[in-house]
Structures are given as structure tokens and as C-alpha cells.
């Protein structure tokens, strides 16, 4: 297909501005009934009302597509994904059906620990190939940008490997999706550091953050701030250190119990707090006041058989709410 493209006779639904919409603003959309999108040399150069697509032969070197009144949307942004990993967890499905909780599965070596073990056993090429396959499927569903997390290594070598794979895919000239990388070394406590969470946070701060920053392997730093994983104080210490080194901040927050993760996200000026199934009223208000995006992951709640996050209450409180897949 030509790099020059005209899509005309489209009903375009498009956002305006470059900042997040909050509260009632989220219900406002710009709709262009007889719209045109112009792409020149692979770059979108015009979105707006029709302006005569065949005038004076201007577009004779463009490929023309008549949308016939169908809806045209911007590409989806999936702002919370883990697409670089090894293995699968099909056996855990039966455990869930029998009523086992997320944390009990983790305690018996399943969940994150299971995927960490499988990921550590795979090399660069195998992990990259699998990740590329996931990106192709996402692209086919209209996704054009993803945030991708590490977090299935929990050691220096494998965490860096995951981030290098994301950089490799993002630098590929044939890529279908733009990737924003997040370092999630604090996804769980590795077996090596069992009972020594503070020491593991020290390791991440001293040995991981500087290397990742120096090599520009990630833009964001994330932490699983949750009872039985990393405490509020441990999360604060890691994120403050990351912020001082120039990382944007994200949190897995208040997924299992109300734990103060939303409040911490607001305190530190995080880009987003994610999950939030158990976020408190105070946490929601604090996020709204601080401009922290509430990223909701309904598929996770569905898989865990948990109530969905209180998205409507977050919007009514003035939060910007995003949806992602996990």
C-alpha cells in the first residue's frame, strides 16, 4: 500500500487536546460526520471535515479509501501489559475454580513465581518471538501503542533481558506497535530474598535503576504495592529513588485489599495507579486531586472473580480513568 492515503466519507470519533480528560469531560467526544484523514509519507497530516478529495488532482498519487459512513477511531492505547514472558498457567484455572485466592496460589509457587521460572529458562530469541506474536495479535485488534512491563525475571539478567527485548521490538523498522517500557522488578519477592524485602528493594535501587536509566531501557518504574508483596514504605522508597533518577512512576495498587496504594500514588505524583479493586474513598479523592490516572483492568477482576473497580465513582470524583488488558 502507498504511504500516501486518503480515507474519506468517514464518521470520525476523535479526542481533542493532548491531556487526559477527567470526570464529566470523559463523556465528551468530538464527532466529525463527513470526515477525512490524510496520510502523507506515512504520517497523518490532516484530520477533519471533507475538503474535496479530488480537487485539482492534488491527491492523484494517494490511495483512496471510501469509508462509506463507517466509524473511524484513533488506534487503541493499552497502558498496562505484560507481553514478554515464558510459560503459561492453564493448570491454575482449576485451582481458581475450586476457590483458591490469588495470594494462596502465589504462596504455593504459582502465579507470578510460575511465570518467572519459565521466563528465566528462555533465551532472547524465543522470548522475542513470543512477544512479537502477542503484538501482532494486539495490532490486529486496533492497538497502536502499548505499555510493556518487565517483572518476570526478578533478577538482574532476566529483568534486563525483558527490557532489551522490548527495546529491540520498538526499534524494529517493521514494527506495528509503539512500545513504552516499564521496569517492574518489584513485581514479587524472589525466592532468593524470601523474608528480606528491604534488602531486595536495596538491590533494585542500587544495582538495577542506574543500569536501566543509563542504557535508556525503560521510561517508567512500577511496584506491586500490596499486602504480602511490598509494603507502602518499601514501595515509597523504591519509587522515590526512581523519581530522583528521572523515571515516571506507576503502581499496582489496592488490588487485593485496601492498602494505601492509591494514596501513595497521589503523594508521589505518579503517572497512574492500576487495578484499584479495593481503593478507598480517600485514595480515589487523592488521585483525582493529584491528577493520577486510574487504570482499570476488568479482565483481571473477572478472572479473579472479584467485583470490578468503582470506575463510575472515580469518574464522578474527577479522576481520569483508563482501561487496559493486563
Name every feature range the model reports, one short phrase each.
Residues 10, 37, 42, 69, ...:
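Divalent metal-coordination and catalytic microenvironments
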Residues 248-249, 258-326:
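Active-site-adjacent C-terminal substructures of enzyme catalytic domains
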Residues 74, 136, 236, 240, ...:
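Alpha-helical segments flanking ligand/cofactor-binding loops in enzyme cores
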Residues 6, 63, 75-77, 249, ...:
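Residue-level marker for buried hydrophobic side chains located in beta-strands
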Residues 1-56:
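N-terminal metal-binding scaffold of metallo-dependent hydrolase/deaminase domains
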Residues 62-129:
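Metal-associated gating/positioning segment near the N- to mid-region
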Residues 6, 12, 61-66, 181:
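Conserved beta-strand scaffold positions in the cores of enzyme catalytic domains, especially
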Residues 115-130, 136, 144-259:
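Metal-coordinating catalytic core of metallo-dependent amide/deamination hydrolases
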Amino acid at each position: 500500500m502507498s504511504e500516501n492515503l486518503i480515507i474519506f466519507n468517514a464518521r470520525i470519533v476523535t479526542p481533542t487536546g493532548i491531556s487526559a480528560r477527567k470526570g464529566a469531560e470523559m463523556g465528551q467526544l468530538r464527532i466529525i460526520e463527513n470526515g477525512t484523514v490524510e496520510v502523507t509519507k506515512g504520517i497523518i497530516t490532516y484530520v477533519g471535515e471533507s475538503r474535496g478529495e479530488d480537487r485539482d488532482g492534488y491527491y492523484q498519487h494517494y490511495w483512496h479509501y471510501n469509508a462509506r459512513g463507517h466509524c473511524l477511531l484513533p488506534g487503541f492505547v493499552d497502558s498496562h501489559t505484560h507481553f514478554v514472558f515464558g510459560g503459561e498457567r492453564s493448570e491454575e484455572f482449576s485451582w481458581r475454580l475450586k476457590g483458591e485466592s490469588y495470594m494462596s496460589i502465589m504462596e504455593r509457587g504459582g502465579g507470578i513465581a510460575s511465570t518467572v521460572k519459565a521466563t528465566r529458562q528462555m533465551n532472547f530469541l524465543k522470548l522475542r518471538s513470543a512477544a512479537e506474536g502477542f503484538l501482532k495479535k494486539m495490532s490486529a485488534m486496533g492497538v497502536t501503542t502499548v505499555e510493556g512491563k518487565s517483572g518476570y525475571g526478578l533478577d538482574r539478567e532476566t529483568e534486563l533481558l525483558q527490557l532489551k527485548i522490548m527495546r529491540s521490538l520498538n526499534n524494529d523498522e517493521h514494527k506495528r506497535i509503539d512500545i513504552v517500557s516499564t521496569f517492574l522488578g518489584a513485581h514479587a519477592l524472589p525466592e532468593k530474598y524470601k523474608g528480606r524485602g528491604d534488602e531486595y528493594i536495596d538491590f533494585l535501587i542500587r544495582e538495577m535503576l542506574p543500569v536501566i536509566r543509563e542504557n535508556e531501557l525503560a521510561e517508567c518504574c512500577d511496584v506491586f504495592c500490596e499486602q504480602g508483596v511490598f509494603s507502602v514504605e518499601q514501595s515509597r522508597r523504591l519509587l522515590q529513588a526512581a523519581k530522583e533518577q528521572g523515571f515516571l512512576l506507576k503502581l499496582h495498587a489496592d488490588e487485593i485489599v485496601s492498602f494505601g496504594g492509591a494514596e501513595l500514588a497521589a503523594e508521589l505524583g505518579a503517572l497512574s495507579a492500576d487495578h484499584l479493586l479495593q481503593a478507598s474513598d480517600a485514595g480515589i479523592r487523592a488521585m483525582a486531586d493529584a491528577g493520577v490516572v486510574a487504570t482499570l483492568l476488568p479482565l483481571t477482576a473477572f478472572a479473579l472473580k472479584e467485583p470490578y473497580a468503582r470506575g463510575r465513582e472515580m469518574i464522578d470524583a474527577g479522576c481520569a480513568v483508563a482501561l487496559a488488558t493486563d
